[in-house]
Structures are given as structure tokens and as C-alpha cells.
């Protein structure tokens, strides 16, 4: 059975419904709520969470979005034992994957969802084989990795203010935000609110990772490694070029950004 309560701590019937199942273990994925101690203590094989980051980096509600916004080159999935803390539990299994430059939050979430399913299929037989007993002993038998607080980052909930694009930032920062907030990044043009869906940073050193059209534009509007940005004739956020069938080139603090959708 699958339960998706809106506020698990405010729905007393949930605890009773779960207890009546007599389940050996509980598995939580993309739930976004902390289980109360009364529920954590119910299943004899523990409560387990499939989390979309390489813990302790990006504990919290938005690990996929923040890994893109902050420009992480890799992310992954971990299966961890749940505790009262927010994503603080020891990790049983973990897999890392690279993040593509042009990958958005929806695409990355789909890849991580598939990986989560694969990892849980691997983890559950191990959890079953370790058997019931005091939590500390069970986890020791499983050989879990205790999370370090070093390198911990928190993936806070995103707000409407986060969605607004600041064109005075770098091309990469703007592009990462559009990808991470997909489909929610916004800007304005002549008093109209626009939603930005697809961008490419016109950075020369990244030409191999860009589309052919963007790589060609990067030769004109990008910067080579070590090259300082020349003073823009137009201020950040201004349109530099409109390319039919491709998109709009927009000025930033350095290299330009190609807005495709």
C-alpha cells in the first residue's frame, strides 16, 4: 500500500493505519516531511528513505533543484535509515551520476527516479537479511555509512523570489538557475512577465557541450579562458541578437545567454 498524507504529524489516523499493516519496513521517497518517532519505531526492519542527492550535500526538500542551481557536476541517490533529523540518517547504498550542462530539473528527476527504484530493489533484500533487533545492532550488521557534518548543505524550499532572473549575474549562473527551476524561472520584457524554459550559456570553453547553433554563437558572444569581459554596449538583460529559428541572445555580466524557449 502507498500512503501520501498531506500532514503526517497532524493526521492521527495515519499512525494507526500504518500499524495495522504489520509491515516489516517503511520506504519513503520524495515525501518532504519528517516522520514522527511513533511511526519511525513501528516497523521491525526500520524506515528507509530514497534521497535524491549524495548526502550530506543537499539535505532537505529541493536537492535536485539546488544541485543544478549551484552547478554541481555530479549528484546521485542514497538509501538511508530515517531518523528524527532532516535527512541525517546513515546511508546504506549510494550511486553517483554526472549532471549534463543542458539538463533541467525535470530530466534529472526522471533519471534519479529510475536510479532510486534500482537502488531500493538492491537495498531491501539486504535490509531483510540483516533482520530485526535494536536499531544500532541492525545498522551495524548492514555496514551503513554514518553521515559527516562536514560538507553538509541544506536544500531549502524555493520561493517566488528565487524564480526571478538577475541578468547582471554570469551566463552560467543564469543558465543554471533556468535549468534548476524548470519550468519556473521568470523575467520581464516591456512590462510582460515571461517564463524561461530553455537556455544555453554562450561560453567558449563549453562549446563542446552546447548545441551546434549555440557553439557558433559562443564564438561571437562568449569569452575565451582568462579573457576579461569587454564593456557591453548594451546593459545586462538587453537583447544582443535575434537568431531566426534558434532564439534570442541576451547580455549578462560577461558572456551572453541564448534563450531558446
Model-derived segments and their meaning:
Residues 1-183, 244, 254-261:
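One-carbon transfer enzymes
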Residues 162-261:
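An anion-binding loop in the catalytic cleft
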